[in-house]
C-alpha cells in the first residue's frame, strides 16, 4: 500500500485494539503482510492473536470485534472492501479497486521518487565499507562488502537519510612494512621460494608488477592523494612503502570505479597516529580507570561492557593491538556528528565488536551503547567452468573483484587493456559484468555463505536472476515501443488518466491483481529493508516482481483492440517498469531498454 494508506489502516486497527484493551496494556505495533494464498485477499493481520492472551479473549471473537470497529472507522472506508476472519484469528482484508488504482496512479505520478522519503527526515548516517588494507587487490570478499555497503547506503538515502560513504585505509602497522619488504625483495630479483625471500612476505604476482614500476621510476596517484614518484632505489624502503601503498590504492580505485562505487571520504589509519588520536584515546581510558597493567601489557576492562574477557590494548613491546586505532577512529565518527554509524565487514571481525564498543563506552563521551551498528557477511566461493576456483593466501592466488567483473562480462575485453589503450568510457564496457556481480552478491542474506557461479552469471535465460529481472524491464520497453513508437516515453503521460478497472476491478485477472499487489508493497519493503539493514531484500523483491510481471505477460495480452483495457494494462506495465527501475537503482544495477 501507499504509506498514507498503510498509516491510516494501521491507525484504525490500533485504535480498535486500544479501545478493547486496559489503559495500561502494552500493545504490539499493527502490521500487515501478504496472505500466503492469494485467494485469501490482499492483506492479512494477526494482531488479534498477538493480544488475545493479554486481553483474556478468544482470538477469533476478538478479531470479530476489531473488524466491526475498523469497518466503522472513516479512515478505513474507501480502502477496505471486505474483511474476513480465518483460522485461529487472522484478519484477511480485500482492498477496494479505488485503493488499488491509487497505488498505480501514485507510481506514475511519483516516478523515480516512488518509494522514497524526503531527504533529511532521519538525519545523518555514516556507512563504512570495503576498508581493505592497501596491501593487495580487492578480492571477492571486498566485492561482497562493496555490493552490500553501497546498496545499503542507497537504501538509507531512499529512506530519507543524509548518507556519508567512508573507506578506512589500514595504512599503518606490520602489514604495510611487510608489503614494502615484499616489493623490495622482488626489486632485488628475489622470488617466492628463494632462501632469502622474507618470512610472511606477500607472494602474489602483483608484487612483481609493483617492483617493476618502482624500478622504472613511474608515478602513481590515488583518488584523494598527491602523486608519488618512485625513486628506483631498492635501498630506499620509505620510497618503496609510499609507492607500493599508493600503487595499490590506485588499483583499488580502478576496481571501485568499475564496480560503480564512490566514497565521500577515504580515512587513513596513519592519520590517527600523526594527529595523536590513538594516544589520546588510550590516555583517556587510563585516566578514567578503564585499564590496568599486567604481564607488562596494558589491558582494557572490556568485561565491564559484556566481553567474555579483558583485552590487551598495548603489548609489552609498546605497540598497540589492532582494535585500539579502531576505537580512536570511531571517536572521530561521533565527533563529526554521525550519531548513526554502520560498519559493513567480514564475519571474521565479529570478535572486535565488543572491544570497540567497550572502548567507546569507557571514554564516556556520551556515545550510546550498541554504537556502531554492524553488518557482517560470510565468505564467497567462486565456481567457474563447473569447478571451484581454488584460492591460496600462501601462494598469493585469489579471485579479485576485477576477475569477477571481467568473467561475468563475457568476451575477452579487460579493464587493464582499456586503461592501457586510453578508452575514455571504459567502465561502460563492463556494465553487464558489474550488474551481474552486484546482483549476485546481494542475492543471499549477508550472514550466509554464497557460491558465485560465473557460468550462471553468463547465461541469458531465466536461470540467471539478474537477466530475469532486467529482461522484464526490457520486455516492457519493447511493448511500449510497439505501442508508441520510438518516442513512447513521451506518451506515457497519456496513461495518467486511464480507467484502471480492467486491472484493479473484479474483472481483472488474478495475474494483474498479483502484479498490482506487488507494486503496492514496494515502499513498505524498502522501509523494512532499511530498518533491518538488509539490502538483499530488494534483490529478493525484484525477482518476485519480475516473476509476477512474466506471469501477467503470459496471461493477459496488452495491445488488445479494446482501448480502455489496453490503456489500463499499459498503465500497469508503466508502473511495473518504474518500480523495476527504482529497485534496480537502489542496488546499483542498470535497467536496460534492450537485451
Swiss-Prot record:
Short motif ('HIGH' region): ranges: 132-142
Pfam families linked to this entry: Arg_tRNA_synt_N, DALR_1, tRNA-synt_1d
GO cellular component annotations of the record: cytoplasm
InterPro entries noted in UniProt: aa-tRNA-synth_I_CS, Arg-tRNA-ligase, Arg-tRNA-synth_N, Arg-tRNA-synth_N_sf, ArgRS_core, DALR_anticod-bd, Rossmann-like_a/b/a_fold, tRNAsynth_Ia_anticodon-bd
Protein location: Cytoplasm
GO molecular function terms listed in the Swiss-Prot or TrEMBL record: arginine-tRNA ligase activity; ATP binding
Biological-process GO terms, alphabetical: arginyl-tRNA aminoacylation
EC number(s) reported in the record: 6.1.1.19
Reaction it catalyzes: tRNA(Arg) + L-arginine + ATP = L-arginyl-tRNA(Arg) + AMP + diphosphate
Domain of life: Bacteria
Entry keyword annotation includes ATP-binding: yes
Keywords on record: Aminoacyl-tRNA synthetase, ATP-binding, Cytoplasm, Ligase, Nucleotide-binding, Protein biosynthesis
Principal location listed in the UniProt entry: cytoplasm
EC class name: ligase
Gene3D superfamilies xref list: Arginyl tRNA synthetase N-terminal domain (3.30.1360.70), HUPs (3.40.50.620), Isoleucyl-tRNA Synthetase, Domain 1 (1.10.730.10)
CDD domains in the record: Anticodon_Ia_Arg (cd07956), ArgRS_core (cd00671)
PANTHER family reported in the protein's UniProt record: ARGININE--TRNA LIGASE, CYTOPLASMIC (PTHR11956:SF5), ARGINYL-TRNA SYNTHETASE (PTHR11956)
Family stated for the protein in its record: Belongs to the class-I aminoacyl-tRNA synthetase family.
Subunit structure: Monomer.
NCBIfam families found in the cross-reference section: argS
Protein's UniProt name: Arginine--tRNA ligase
UniProt source species: Cupriavidus necator (strain ATCC 17699 / DSM 428 / KCTC 22496 / NCIMB 10442 / H16 / Stanier 337)
Gene name as annotated: argS
Amino acid at each position: 500500500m501507499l504509506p498514507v494508506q498503510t498509516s491510516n489502516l494501521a491507525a484504525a486497527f490500533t485504535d480498535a485494539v486500544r479501545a478493547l484493551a486496559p489503559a495500561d496494556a502494552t500493545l504490539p505495533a499493527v502490521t500487515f503482510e501478504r496472505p500466503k494464498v492469494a485467494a485469501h485477499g490482499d492483506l492479512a493481520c494477526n494482531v488479534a492473536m498477538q493480544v488475545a492472551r493479554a486481553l483474556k479473549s478468544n482470538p477469533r471473537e476478538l478479531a470479530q470485534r476489531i473488524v466491526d470497529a475498523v469497518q466503522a472507522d472513516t479512515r478505513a472506508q474507501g480502502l477496505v472492501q471486505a474483511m474476513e476472519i480465518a483460522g485461529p484469528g487472522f484478519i484477511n482484508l480485500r482492498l477496494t479497486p479505488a485503493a488499488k488504482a491509487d497505488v498505480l496512479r501514485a507510481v506514475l505520478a511519483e516516478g523515480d521518487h516512488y518509494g522514497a522519503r524526503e531527504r533529511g527526515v532521519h538525519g545523518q548516517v555514516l556507512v563504512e565499507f570495503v576498508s581493505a588494507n592497501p596491501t593487495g587487490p580487492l578480492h571477492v570478499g571486498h566485492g561482497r562488502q562493496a555490493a552490500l555497503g553501497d546498496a545499503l547506503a542507497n537504501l538509507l538515502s531512499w529512506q530519507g537519510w543524509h548518507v556519508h560513504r567512508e573507506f578506512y585505509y589500514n595504512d599503518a602497522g606490520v602489514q604495510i612494512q611487510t608489503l614494502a619488504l615484499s616489493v623490495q625483495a622482488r626489486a632485488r630479483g628475489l622470488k617466492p621460494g628463494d632462501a632469502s625471500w622474507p618470512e610472511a612476505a606477500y607472494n602474489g604476482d602483483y608484487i612483481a608488477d609493483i617492483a617493476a614500476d618502482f624500478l622504472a621510476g613511474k608515478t602513481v596517484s590515488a583518488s584523494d592523494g598527491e602523486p608519488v614518484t618512485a625513486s628506483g632505489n631498492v635501498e630506499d624502503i620509505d620510497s618503496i612503502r609510499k609507492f607500493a601503498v599508493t600503487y595499490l590504492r590506485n588499483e583499488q580505485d580502478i576496481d571501485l570505479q568499475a564496480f560503480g562505487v564512490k566514497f565521500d571520504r577515504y580515512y587513513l589509519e596513519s592519520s590517527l597516529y600523526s594527529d595523536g588520536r590513538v594516544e589520546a584515546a588510550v590516555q583517556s581510558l587510563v585516566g578514567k580507570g578503564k585499564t590496568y597493567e599486567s604481564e607488562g601489557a596494558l589491558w582494557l576492562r572490556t568485561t565491564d561492557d559484556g566481553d567474555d574477557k579483558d583485552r590487551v590494548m598495548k603489548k609489552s613491546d609498546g605497540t598497540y593491538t589492532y582494535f585500539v586505532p579502531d576505537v580512536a577512529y570511531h571517536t572521530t565518527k561521533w565527533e563529526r556528528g554521525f550519531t548513526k554509524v554502520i560498519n559493513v565487514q567480514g564475519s571474521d571481525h565479529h570478535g572486535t565488536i565488543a572491544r570497540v564498543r567497550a572502548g567507546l563506552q569507557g571514554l564516556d563521551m556520551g556515545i550510546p551503547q550498541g554504537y556502531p551498528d554492524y553488518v557482517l557477511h560470510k565468505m564467497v566461493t567462486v565456481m567457474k567452468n563447473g569447478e571451484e576456483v581454488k584460492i591460496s593466501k600462501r601462494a598469493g592466488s585469489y579471485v579479485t573483484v576485477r576477475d569477477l567483473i571481467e568473467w561475468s562480462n563475457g568476451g575477452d575485453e579487460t579493464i587493464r587493456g582499456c586503461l592501457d589503450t586510453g578508452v575514455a568510457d571504459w567502465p561502460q564496457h563492463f556494465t553487464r559484468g558489474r550488474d551481474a556481480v552486484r546482483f549476485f552478491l546481494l542475492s543471499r542474506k549477508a550472514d550466509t555463505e554464497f557460491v558465485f557461479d560465473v557460468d550462471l552469471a553468463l547465461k541469458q535465460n531465466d536461470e540467471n536472476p539478474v537477466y530475469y529481472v532486467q529482461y522484464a524491464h526490457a520486455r516492457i520497453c519493447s511493448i511500449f515501443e510497439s505501442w508508441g513508437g520510438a518516442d513512447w516515453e513521451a506518451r506515457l503521460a497519456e496513461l495518467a488518466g486511464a480507467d484502471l478497472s480492467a486491472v484493479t476491478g473484479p474483472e481483472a485477472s488474478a495475474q494483474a491483481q498479483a502484479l498490482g499487489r506487488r507494486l503496492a508493497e514496494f515502499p513498505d519493503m524498502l522501509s523494512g529493508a532499511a530498518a533491518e539493514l538488509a539490502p538483499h531484500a530488494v534483490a529478493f523483491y525484484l525477482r518476485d516482481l519480475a516473476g509476477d510481471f512474466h506471469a501477467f505477460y503470459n496471461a493477459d495480452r496488452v495491445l488488445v483492440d479494446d482501448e480502455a483495457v489496453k490503456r489500463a494494462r499499459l498503465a500497469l506495465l508503466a508502473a511495473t517498469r518504474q518500480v523495476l527501475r527504482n529497485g534496480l537503482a537502489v542496488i546499483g544495477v542498470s535497467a536496460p531498454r534492450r537485451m
